[in-house]
Structure formats: C-alpha cells, structure tokens
Amino acid sequence: MIVDILSLFPGYFKGPFDESILKRAQEKGLLTIRLTDIRDFADNRFHRVDDRPYGGGPGMVMMPQPVTMAIQHVKTPEAKVIYLSPQGRTLNAVKCRQLALEKHLILLCGHYEGIDQRVLDEEVDEEISIGDYVLTNGCLAAIVLLDAFSRFIPGVLGHPSAAAEDSFEGGLLDYPHYTRPEVFQGCSVPNVLLSGNHQEIAKWRHEQALKKTQEIRPDLLA
C-alpha cells in the first residue's frame, strides 16, 4: 500500500515511522509512506498557505490553492483522499479493516482552524476523526490512523492472528495477558492459563473479555 501524507510539518512524522512495526513494514515492501509539504505548492513568494476566514472569527484557514495542488500532485486514479478532522466519522476497527484493503491512501492533515470547505467538497472522499476532542493539528491523527489500519495489512504483524484477537474484534475488549514470572509480588497467574487445556483457556479468555467489556464499555454490547 502507498500512503501519502500531506501536511505543513513533514518532519513531524520522522520518528514514528522509523521505528518498530511500521519501519519493518516499509522494509518488507508492504507499506510505502511518502511525506509532502503543502507549503511547496503555495503560489506566492512567501509560501503563505493560510488567511483570515470570511465572515470573521478567530484563527486562520488553510487556503484552497496550495492544498488542492498538493493533493493533485500525488493523486492517482485509485487513490482515496482522507481528511483528518474532528468533524469526521469516528475511527473504529471496522473502518481500519476497510482502509487496509486500499491500494493508495492520501491523508490530509489540517492545521489552524481547518481547510477551506471547497477543497473538502471537491477533493476529499472521507473525513475521519480519531475521537471527540481537538488536537493542535492533524499530524498526530494521521499517525494514529496509519498505525491502526496498517496492523490489518497481511504480513505487517508477526503473527497472522494477532490483530484478530485485539480489543474490538468480535465486539469485545481484549482479555488479560500474563507472562513470566508465574508469581510476581505475591500475585499469581490464573491457574487455567497454566493448565494446557486450550478449550478451557479459550473459554476463560472469552469470559474475561466479556466481563471487561461490561464493566468498561457496555455500549459495545448494546
């Protein structure tokens, strides 16, 4: 998959994409991440990309010209353009699975008060929010989105069933996990996990996942 990220701060992404799972996914050719600076497409000598909003109000709005040019520069016929925005539909595991099937995604990061609506109307296919809160810019949201859906790309995770057993898969939160030592500060690993009985272990894990979901996220069971 190819992922183009358009923002005003491409250097923001260097660390997260150069470590751990996302780094290995790129090295294996499963994921290609390209960064584009929207300022490079400004048609003025000061590379200005924002201006005051019509109608008044606080803050600045990203102008349509540089954003549109940046999108069109990387866009292909099969590309899907996503704008990271608190006004978008809230991201969930189902959406992550859907995005993992795409061949080319363009992630548009907003800054200031947002982007001129004409760009969203003409160039953007979908707006996605990572939660009901506001960040200083869309870069963090793009990192979260990319990390979340990339886990569903075949081969990205070490074990093929790893993503299938995570929280929200099957409509439940994840079950508790334990590793060595068997006893730590007086707390022991549940006996069922030491039994070797895979049927009982699976039953216990489902019960624990259901219990945690009922306590913390009962809305998932509604």
From Swiss-Prot:
Record has Transmembrane as a keyword: no
Entry binding sites for S-adenosyl-L-methionine: G110, I130, G131, D132, Y133, V134, L135
Reactions catalysed, as given in the entry: guanosine(37) in tRNA + S-adenosyl-L-methionine = N(1)-methylguanosine(37) in tRNA + S-adenosyl-L-homocysteine + H(+)
InterPro entries listed in its UniProt record: Alpha/beta_knot_MTases (IPR029028), tRNA_m1G_MeTrfase_C_sf (IPR023148), tRNA_m1G_MeTrfase_TrmD (IPR002649), tRNA_m1G_MTases_N (IPR029026), tRNA_MeTrfase_TRMD/TRM10 (IPR016009)
Enzyme Commission designation: 2.1.1.228
Keyword terms: Cytoplasm, Methyltransferase, S-adenosyl-L-methionine, Transferase, tRNA processing
Alphabetical list of NCBIfam families matching this protein: PRK00026.1 (NF000648), trmD (TIGR00088)
Sequence similarity: Belongs to the RNA methyltransferase TrmD family.
Protein name: tRNA (guanine-N(1)-)-methyltransferase
Organism of derivation: Protochlamydia amoebophila (strain UWE25)
Gene: trmD
